[in-house]
């Protein structure tokens, strides 16, 4: 193409409230594969990723760590960028919503929507989840808590996170104004939401029941972009975070040349849990701004474990670094894109991961390369013979297989069916391995009159590997180069455009001794290793508190009787466990973070660790605390109270739990 066609692809921007696991990395790797594919096809690609850094959750997290929100997000953003470097993510820009240019553009967008009447000032009352950064109506709650009179006093969001009743002044976006126009757009652009099932979900669950106007500002926290004309309000996540896809290109700035060049996005890739925000809120916002909508929003499935979603409390979190360090980057990228049909949920198991590395990479691909390099060295002095077709009875079948694979591969990649595209590559790998057995070059080498056939087998195998390596380039960032190197080829000349079987360069010498690119693994050993790493995932990510290694002795009273006046001084309260984890260097201590109805969370250390091997299982429970106990220093930390436990005759301790419906801070008489 004389002037390159543009291709703009985006990941969602990640919320940096914790360490990213392979489920988070899945989206980014898939986007990276698509970006690399399009570059290899000659497109002018712009690949955007980044982090969403504002909100109440970040503000609270920073306060708990005794740092400013900006200090906290600076550290987390650096960690995300470090991970993307580890995963060799070829993004063109990394946006942070704390970037000055983004904040200025968001203020401009908000003001415009107010001026044209799409945003108005009102008052909001609803159930809010800090973890989800989302409001819910009572009917949307997965679980509802009621008092004795039947009044709703709390509950849980569909995600399982606790909600709290929030009433505050807020600016609202007139979603309902654009509902009919959005439905019409869906009908006229059936490719807009992929897979198709996601579109039906949006229509039936959200649009047809009636779109409610959306709260787009908050006053109950300050860590956000302030409104220029009403600074007590900060812009809420919908306009702040979603706008990044255009502000990153310069929309709202003096230089919007990138926006003019790349917008609308070709693909916006998101997890299925945020499809609603990207296919309802986002397109309506763009309609209000008179901007074209992205061409496609693809909502992929989740990467699950056998026992459901990844969770530190379950000890089943897999972090990409631990797999890359032991098995290499390409092993992880290959597995994530091959094992899971993109768009559907997939299940990660250590057994499946290790088995695929063995069978697909070590056995199929690795052996094909090793055998080919060894035979070319042995039978042709390392020089790849010139290409000749139809010399053996099996040549045509192999070249036809390659041609079919190339066509089906491109078709699958354009649809983002990554697992299908990779499966097509392995069709050629398998056929080439079978070709070796069919032609038996070790037999041909014994007869001089079979020399032409032997050389034909060698070039057909080398050419098959060249095709395989070219097609693998979007998926694996290191392995194709290793294959090219062993084949004696220049990676810079191995383009994907107009690739055909039979174009292997002349006068090429392979490496004198091939190196295995994927060693075979001992399955049982590696499964045990991964499981151990998963079980350590909680302690490995304790980032909140640096514990003093000095031992602490807990003192308990032995008195049987006290005066009533003494007891009357004790203030017992209901508190909710917000976080709970073991104290490093102390086998007996657990560190609790509790909401006891105070302005800030309180910290209590308790010597019950041996009775709760999975501390995270206590999160969300309502416990009873001594709230007015004089703070004491333990392990270099302040313990602000005591958690009540019951002791069995055998000496086993169990936390005393309060009724779930009791509000945090309720007194106990």
Swiss-Prot record:
Catalyzed reaction equations: tRNA(Met) + L-methionine + ATP = L-methionyl-tRNA(Met) + AMP + diphosphate
MF terms (GO), sorted A to Z: ATP binding; metal ion binding; methionine-tRNA ligase activity; tRNA binding
EC number assigned by the record: 6.1.1.10
Domain tRNA-binding intervals: 566-669
Residues holding ATP: 312
Keyword Transcription regulation included in the entry's annotation: no
Top-level division of the source organism's lineage: Bacteria
A GO cellular component entry from the record: cytoplasm
Location of the motif 'KMSKS' region: 309-313
GO biological process, alphabetically ordered: methionyl-tRNA aminoacylation
SUPFAM superfamilies named in the record: Anticodon-binding domain of a subclass of class I aminoacyl-tRNA synthetases, Nucleic acid-binding proteins, Nucleotidylyl transferase
Record keywords, A-Z: Aminoacyl-tRNA synthetase, ATP-binding, Cytoplasm, Ligase, Metal-binding, Nucleotide-binding, Protein biosynthesis, RNA-binding, tRNA-binding, Zinc
Pfam families for this protein: Anticodon_3, tRNA-synt_1g, tRNA_bind
'HIGH' region (motif): residue ranges: 14-24
Broad class of where this protein is predominantly found: cytoplasm
Localization per Swiss-Prot or TrEMBL: Cytoplasm
PANTHER family recorded: METHIONINE--TRNA LIGASE, MITOCHONDRIAL, METHIONYL-TRNA SYNTHETASE
Quaternary context: Homodimer.
The protein's name in its UniProt record: Methionine--tRNA ligase
Gene name of the encoded protein: metG
